Amino acid sequence: MKARIIVLLASLLCANAYAQNGYSASTAQSSGQNDTVYSTNQVGKPATNGGKVYSTTQVQPPDPVTDAVRKRFQLRFQDLKIGVVRPTPYGLFEVQLGGDMFYTDKDVSWVMKGPLIDAATRRDVTRENLEKLSAVSFSELPLDLAIKQVKGQGKHRIAIFEDPNCGYCKQLRHTLKEMDDVTIYTFLYPILSPDSTVKARDVLCAADPGKVLDAWMLEGKPPAPAHCRAPIEELVALGEKLRVRGTPTLFFEDNTRAAGVLPPAQLRERLTRNVSQ
């Protein structure tokens, strides 16, 4: 058996580790190469269980050892809401806390935060598992809240959460501009600043929201002031429920998601794959 090296990034675990702003760059695996995926992070509150459930992930009952790990973890961190707990092939136990993944031993004598990298395959195991746990049924997304734009026949569908002031979202817009045969559903998610809320309202209240959004994101032409009953609160609540922790966040028809700007080739592959499967 090939030896495998597990790379762990240590992190302090605190009770209120769900409030931070800023920019981040994380590494994703694609076709055997490392692609840098950029996103603007805004960590929201953990999703509640109220309302419609969008996750398609089914959790199996834990075995006695895993159940004991959960109980020990909860005993040591009584103020945290624990999600999925399960063993890994690497001799560790994976513990989901909101949108983060932590690792511990069977005695919960130490806790470390991912990402966990499989050195043999160079896969980001943490990212893969979080994507599975955060799977969202595309057909259940409330697309009536989104700005719909059809390019070509619109065969490929994608839903995107964007902040109007997100630089990486603008970069993604330029990538999508070069693509055809795609239907884009944009959920405006104003989380970066009060001005983001104003711009989101102005876009949503415009006569042609898609045209105004592109003018701002692609050309830097700010939307004209507009007033209406824009569903800002509903959009923010939706993003929190779906654990959208940064912009842009992309949702595909195969119920997977991606955080950040994907390289053009990888984005095309994801769109094509979703239709063929």
Swiss-Prot record:
Signal peptide: 1-19
UniProt KW keywords: Disulfide bond, Periplasm, Redox-active center, Signal
Cellular component aspect of the GO annotation: periplasmic space
Cysteine pairings via disulfide bonds: 166-169, 205-228
Source taxon at top rank: Bacteria
InterPro entries, sorted: DiS-bond_Isoase_DsbC/G, DiS-bond_isomerase_DsbC/G_N, DiS-bond_isomerase_DsbC/G_N_sf, Thiol:disulfide_interchange, Thioredoxin-like_fold, Thioredoxin-like_sf, Thioredoxin_CS
Family, as annotated: Belongs to the thioredoxin family. DsbC subfamily.
Function according to Swiss-Prot or TrEMBL: Required for disulfide bond formation in some periplasmic proteins. Acts by transferring its disulfide bond to other proteins and is reduced in the process.
Name assigned to this protein: Probable thiol:disulfide interchange protein DsbC
Organism of origin: Bordetella avium (strain 197N)
Gene this chain is encoded by: dsbC
